[in-house]
Amino acid sequence: MGLFDRLRGNDTPRVAFIGIDGLSHRLVADNPDTFPTLAAIADEGDGGPIDSAVPPESSACWPVLTSGVNPGETGVYGFQDREVGSYDTYVPMGRDVQATRVWDRATDAGLDATVMNVPVTFPPQRTVQRMVSGHLSPDVDKASHPDELREYLTESDYRLSVNAKLGHQEDKTEFIEQARETLDARAEAFNRYVEMDDWDLFVGVFSTPDRINHFLWGDYEDGGPYREDVLEFY
């Protein structure tokens, strides 16, 4: 049984938000056989290209996506922001997001939320039943709540992200292998807590596709040596 089958659950109303970071709508549209589930969702429901937030930087976009308001209200404009009234800079984290996130609305309404690997959520919030923070978090140990989640992720060699240094090497073999391992471990963790938790809202983000696209998209577009590796990864 796949992740999407597990998410269907019973008749109790609930919401699952699955993020696939960096996935191009054009890539799905041009390769429906590679993406049968997403292609079916687009055919039976809706799908299409979307415009990014302004500025189009990941650290600004994820708070926008999870709060529904623009950077002027989230207070996060990029990977590095400036302290008000000075030229000192800092890296925005979850505590710097000034807007209410969707899981905050759920918990405020007395609902249970499980949140996994969303960027710009460090440190993990103790107000939700389970959270592992995403990109820019220092390590799994500090990014996980509660203890059971921390212990499971540590024992299963769960990675918060792929080692980008590998992507800069001329031979991308090790980078691609680690990307696959990271994706598999994340899918396994998502499956575990989709089944284990009594959740009303599940939010999980696969960030590895974004890393693949950063380093291999040119090969896909131009017919480079790693073009087929991109499609095989997906």
Can you say where each PLM-predicted feature lies in the sequence?
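Acidic/polar loop patches that form or flank catalytic/metal-binding clefts of enzymes
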Residues: G48-D51, E73
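Short Gly/Pro-enriched turn/cap motifs at secondary-structure boundaries
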Residues: A53-V54, M93
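His/Asp/Glu-rich, glycine-adjacent segments
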Residues: N70-R227
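Glycine-rich loop at the start of a catalytic domain that most often binds anionic cofactors/ligands
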Residues: A60-N70
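Beta-strand elements within well-structured catalytic alpha/beta cores of enzymes
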Residues: T12-V28, I41, L65, A106, ...
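Generic recognition of stable, solvent-exposed alpha-helical segments in well-folded globular domains
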Residues: I18, L23, D33-P36, A60, ...
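A short acidic, glycine-rich active-site loop
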Residues: R227-Y234
